[in-house]
Amino acid sequence: MRTIIACIVALLLFVIAVVIYGVVHNQQATRTGSLCAEYGIPADDPRSNPEPLPETDETGENREVAPDNSIKMNQPLDVHGIRSRYHVFARGVDFSKPVGVVMRLHGDGAYEYDHPEGLLNCMASVAASHNMILVAPRTPDHEGTRTWWENIGESSVWLSGLISQLREDYGNVDTHNMWWMGYSGGAELISYGLLAQEPENITAGAIMIGGGGAPTDKPDPAPALNARLPLYWYVGSKDNGKDPRSTFNALNAANNGAHWYRSRGYDNVQEYVMDGDDHFSIPQAKILDDVLNNQK
């Protein structure tokens, strides 16, 4: 009898162990497959599962810093009275070697900035694999929807100050190897303002995702300065403004922006329409990785 009871107990313990293992394994598999896969990084890629970020909130009052200073969240910056904040992701970057910069501008409303644990953390993982820090600023526009493009002059002044701050904080960061990547309204700022007015700040290239229209009231840029500058436009084939979640016709904007710069002497303009993607599904982390790989 005791032998039977012992066997039953052993069997129950074995079943419990199998169940626990299955739950843990499924949780790990879910995490592995869900963190960065939706942004285009395969689940079996080590970069698809970055470590969690320091705790933050949407108020912008906290200034969380990782113990090794590899991640800085919500850092305040005042540039001639223009105030905003920014995140810096430097985890996994080797500062004994040349370090580049990816400056990533959020879309209207700053959702990505307020929720950095998803897309931004995955993009930082990609940037680090190219030995680049990821900088994610928040627009100094504090009214309404919070956009970059409604006050291009103020946004540009503040971003120039941010570049100076990065040089001061990270002396060996090469701001001559700075890629700008803008999504939606962030792409509009790059194409309307920075490329047309301050091309000297875009030293390595620019990536416009889900936007990036043609300037309408700006003088033509000097193509002799940046004729070979790589300019990329990526937009989803369904990003045509018919989705009630996004009435902005990014397809037209991207086409117009790419044509405008190409017609003004920029001969390294590339435009990609992502089949089946809309304004929200376009794989931004993969795009960043693909573009940086193309420069090697």
List each model region and its residues.
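Primarily recognizes the serine-hydrolase "nucleophile elbow" in alpha/beta-hydrolase
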Residues: 169, 176-226
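Alpha/beta-hydrolase active-site loop
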Residues: 148-172
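Cell-envelope and extracellular/periplasmic
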Residues: 105-110, 167, 183, 190, ...
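Loop/turn elements at helix/coil->beta-strand transitions in domains of secreted/extracellular proteins
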Residues: 97-101, 129-135, 174-179, 199-206, ...
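A domain-start/cap signature at the N-terminus of enzymes
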Residues: 4-8, 13-101, 193, 256-259, ...
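Short substrate-entry loop that stabilizes the transition state in hydrolases
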Residues: 94-145
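Short, flexible/disordered intra-domain loops and linkers
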Residues: 112-117, 144-151, 240-252
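The feature captures the conserved acid-bearing segment of alpha/beta-hydrolase catalytic domains
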Residues: 204-285, 289-293
